Amino acid sequence: MNKSIAPAPVVAAGDVKFGNSLPLSVIAGPCQLESRAHALEVASALKEIATRLGIGLVYKTSFDKANRTSAASARGIGLDAALAIFAEIRDSVGLPVLTDVHEAEQCARAAEAVDILQIPAFLCRQTDLLLAAAATGRIVNVKKGQFLAPWDMGNVVAKITTAGNQKVLVTERGASFGYNTLVSDMRALPIMARTTGAPVIFDATHSVQQPGGKGTSSGGEREFVPVLARAAVAVGVAGVFIETHPDPDHAPSDGPNMVPLRDFEALLRTLMEFDALAKKRPGAGTI
């Protein structure tokens, strides 16, 4: 292991740059990788929106939802089937790709076809997983655990940089507040920026999730996604993470907190306006 080094203040996935003082970028896509056709449909629509608005966009989706509430819940198509789809989105659609990994053994294989490996919030302290993700040389996006203080993310990031990888993003996705409820403390955004030195992302859709709130699945309050997203962008962040779907009410996972694809562009336009205002003057909007 190397001596711990500082994470890079600007991280680039292809042409998409993440930096706390740079113009806003976005990570977006459906919760679950449902099929090749569905993935390409959504990715193509998001590519068109990003091009029209002039914003950097990374496509996200999950090949396996390993922490579903119920054993009967749909988990996804699996890594073997996903790799070719990830590569097609990168090469044919022209978007960088993010996916989450749950086991150290998945990291090297997933890294063959994606630009960003994401560490789920529940696994953010798993040292072997963090080291395996870091060893791929890909960008590592770590979601802060719902149980973790924002200042504790410094130790999490140090595990990655100690392995020699400076390409780290940290994501806020809410904190547990009693049962089946999360709250977003906007102080966490500048605290994580200060204690980690990494670009900070705000996950606007999982922050409105109600974990296990529907008995055998999680609930959500998608009407509050724009509210929290605007608040985070007004603070000044490197990017926002927004799950979106053509028909979220019939999605296999996280439907209650996903933004309908038809509403995505209007939301993004608003967030870009907030971001421009927050970062209008030199030094302003830098968390």
UniProtKB/Swiss-Prot annotation:
GO terms for biological process: keto-3-deoxy-D-manno-octulosonic acid biosynthetic process. The gene is kdsA. Its main location: cytoplasm. GO terms for cellular component: cytoplasm. It comes from the Bacteria. It is found in: Cytoplasm. Pfam families: DAHP_synth_1. Pathway: Carbohydrate biosynthesis; 3-deoxy-D-manno-octulosonate biosynthesis; 3-deoxy-D-manno-octulosonate from D-ribulose 5-phosphate: step 2/3; Bacterial outer membrane biogenesis; lipopolysaccharide biosynthesis. This is 2-dehydro-3-deoxyphosphooctonate aldolase. Belongs to the KdsA family. Its EC number is 2.5.1.55. PANTHER family: PHOSPHO-2-DEHYDRO-3-DEOXYHEPTONATE ALDOLASE (PTHR21057). GO terms for molecular function: 3-deoxy-8-phosphooctulonate synthase activity.
